[in-house]
């Protein structure tokens, strides 16, 4: 069905991949184009040939800049001299489509004018061209489709603001396993202590590339429990929000427990996580905020864009230990890894090779999904125990 709009009405429409599908497809054209189509139809049998692209393998985020002048005619040519190339993998966590938005602003701007989110099919890789130079960019991806296409994208995972050089050829992977609570390696936020106050903001969802997000902005229901203990006694419950925690001056042993629960058709991996960080802290000298030594584990899973690895043979799981920015790198480290193929009901210790901050675990063949339980510690007494149920899939 072809619908010709009146002369005083717009033919503008929006396609969405979700919703009811009618048995007869309909297309809308503007009045002037419609008149030519009607004239051709009146002359006899007319054929209309259409080429449609539902999911383009390319995307352009272009910023046209004219320094020190206002040109009479604005012309922008995308070239290798002014544009970076980024291959972006949009991870499939269960939903067939996702929202994404790359916010952009000039150095003198205080906020971005970008106001429209975009749709992208999950489980795909797209070649994206981004203007280089002095522009600031920040990419954000929500693992499913939101209800509003016109407001800025708030939820999901976010990268740190960055610039591109024209010769940059980079890759991004969104929602790559293992997604878990973590202090991002790419920057803020960093847990700190100022005097006798602890600021323990830890994003509940961080992927393998360091993109981070918060449960309250996740786009769907998630349960979070967070508690702080000092010398074995609970001193704060942060389950309702990350607020400063008052403490005492003397050196003490602290423990931060963070648990997440999220399971839906749109979220098949990392359905449950339990993380416990332990460290020692005393009142620091001065009034500046001092980063806290919450030992981190970064994971390197040889997964595809759907978050799965071949299950018919063993595979290697990479693990890297690090401290938050501002804390010396860990030394005298140890790592223990257990895996489960039945959702955490039974566990099996696996071989771990490596030293320093880089280790490799050999995960046995299996079916379904891999759950992980990792224990790591360093010479300073900092430790982390992290359990991720259904961390990634087996195909």
Show the residue positions of the predicted features.
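Exposed beta-strand face motif in extracellular beta-rich ectodomains
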Residues: 252-254, 368-372
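Structured lumen-facing ectodomains of secretory-pathway proteins
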Residues: 1-154, 161
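Conserved Ser/Thr-centered positions that define the repeating blades of beta-propeller domains
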Residues: 229, 338-341
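Short amphipathic, basic-aromatic surface patches that mediate peripheral association
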Residues: 92-98, 185-217, 320-328
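Short, compositionally biased P/S/T/A/G/V-rich stretches that sit at domain boundaries
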Residues: 50-61, 68, 171-196, 284-310
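Short strand-edge motifs at loop-to-beta-strand transitions and within beta-strands
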Residues: 243, 357-361
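Edge beta-strands of extracellular beta-sandwich domains
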Residues: 263-285, 382-392
């Amino acid at each position: 069905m072809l619908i010709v709009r009146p002369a005083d009405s717009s033919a503008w429409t929006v396609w969405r991949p979700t919703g009811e599908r009618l048995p007869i497809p309909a297309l809308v054209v503007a009045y002037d184009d419609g008149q030519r189509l009607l004239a051709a139809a009146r002359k006899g049998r007319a054929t209309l040939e259409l080429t449609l692209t539902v999911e383009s393998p390319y995307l352009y985020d272009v910023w046209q800049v004219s320094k020190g002048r206002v040109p009479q005619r604005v012309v922008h040519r995308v070239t290798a001299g002014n544009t970076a190339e980024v291959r972006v993998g949009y991870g499939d966590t269960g939903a067939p489509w996702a929202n994404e938005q790359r916010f952009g602003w000039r150095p003198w701007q205080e906020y971005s004018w970008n106001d429209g989110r975009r749709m992208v099919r999950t489980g795909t890789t797209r070649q994206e061209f981004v203007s280089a130079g002095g522009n600031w960019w920040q990419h954000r991806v929500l693992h499913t489709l939101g209800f509003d296409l016109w407001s800025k994208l708030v939820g999901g995972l976010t990268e740190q603001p960055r610039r591109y050089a024209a010769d940059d050829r980079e890759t991004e992977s969104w929602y790559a396993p293992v997604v878990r609570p973590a202090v991002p390696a790419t920057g803020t936020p960093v847990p700190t202590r100022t005097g006798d106050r602890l600021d323990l903001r830890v994003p509940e969802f961080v992927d393998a590339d360091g993109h981070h997000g918060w449960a309250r902005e996740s786009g769907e229901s998630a349960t979070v429990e967070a508690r702080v203990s000092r010398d074995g006694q609970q001193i704060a419950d942060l389950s309702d929000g990350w607020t400063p925690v008052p403490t005492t001056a003397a050196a003490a042993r602290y423990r931060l427990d963070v648990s997440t629960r999220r399971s839906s058709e749109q979220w098949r991996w990392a359905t449950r996580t339990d993380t416990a960080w332990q460290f020692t802290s005393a009142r620091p000298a001065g009034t500046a905020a001092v980063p806290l030594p919450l030992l981190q584990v970064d994971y390197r899973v040889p997964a595809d864009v759907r978050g799965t690895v071949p299950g018919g043979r063993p595979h290697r799981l990479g693990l890297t230990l690090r401290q938050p920015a501002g804390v010396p790198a860990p030394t005298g480290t140890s790592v223990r890894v257990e895996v489960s193929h039945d959702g955490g009901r039974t566990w099996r210790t696996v071989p771990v090779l490596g030293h320093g901050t880089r280790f490799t675990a050999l995960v046995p063949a299996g079916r379904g999904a891999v759950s992980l339980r990792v224990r790591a510690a360093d010479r300073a007494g900092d430790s982390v125990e992290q359990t991720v149920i259904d961390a990634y899939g087996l195909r």
